[in-house]
A protein has these predicted regions:
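NTP-dependent nucleotidyl-transfer catalytic core
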Residues: 1-178
Length: 178
């Protein structure tokens, strides 16, 4: 899937020294400086395109855009991936409610989102992946999890069983019950 038009980044004056960037590390429960690396990988969850984007979306993408720009300004390579959930219950429900084809609704909202990102001058991801185009990978992963006994069913929907993952909660510090 195509993302949006790239944004020109003017060169940073070589005399400018960037301060160290610290980020919250949920696993260690504190702010820690980013390690110095040549390559950083960023993944950001994208929208479910059933309605117009809003300030909450903008806040997320602007936050990651700042981190992306900071890393590039430090001379690092950044591999930035973002998904888009272009098939999901809220999208299907909105399409049914409005009497429109869900694919057309998704496409129209994706175009609006792209326009918003261009207007906000957000750097586009290197890879912009829709769920529809990744469906074979998704169904294969679900099949593997089901074969391992790592899923359970409620009303014909499959859910991941957090009890199947001994490390569940190790980064978030959440108990299985939470």
């Amino acid at each position: 899937m195509k993302s949006w038009a790239t944004v020109a980044i003017p060169p940073l004056d070589k005399r400018f020294v960037l301060p160290e960037l610290s980020l919250w590390d949920t696993a260690r429960a504190g702010n820690f400086p980013l390690p110095n690396k040549n390559l950083y990988r960023i993944y950001v969850c994208g929208i479910t395109p059933y309605d117009a984007t809003h300030l909450g979306h903008a806040a997320t993408y602007l936050t990651f855009d700042l981190a992306h720009r900071y890393l590039r300004a430090r001379g690092a390579q950044v591999r930035f991936v973002q998904n888009i959930t272009d098939i999901d219950d809220p999208l299907l429900e909105r399409a049914t409610r409005d009497g429109v084809d869900w694919k057309e609704l998704a496409q129209s909202q994706i175009e609006l989102f792209r326009g918003d990102m261009v207007n906000l001058h957000v750097l586009p991801p290197d890879h912009y992946i829709g769920v529809v185009e990744a469906m074979d990978l998704v169904t294969s992963a679900i099949s593997t999890l089901s074969e391992r006994g790592s899923t359970y069913s409620v009303d014909n929907d499959l859910y991941f069983s957090v009890h199947a993952d001994k490390k569940f909660g190790s980064r978030s510090h959440l108990a299985h019950e939470e």
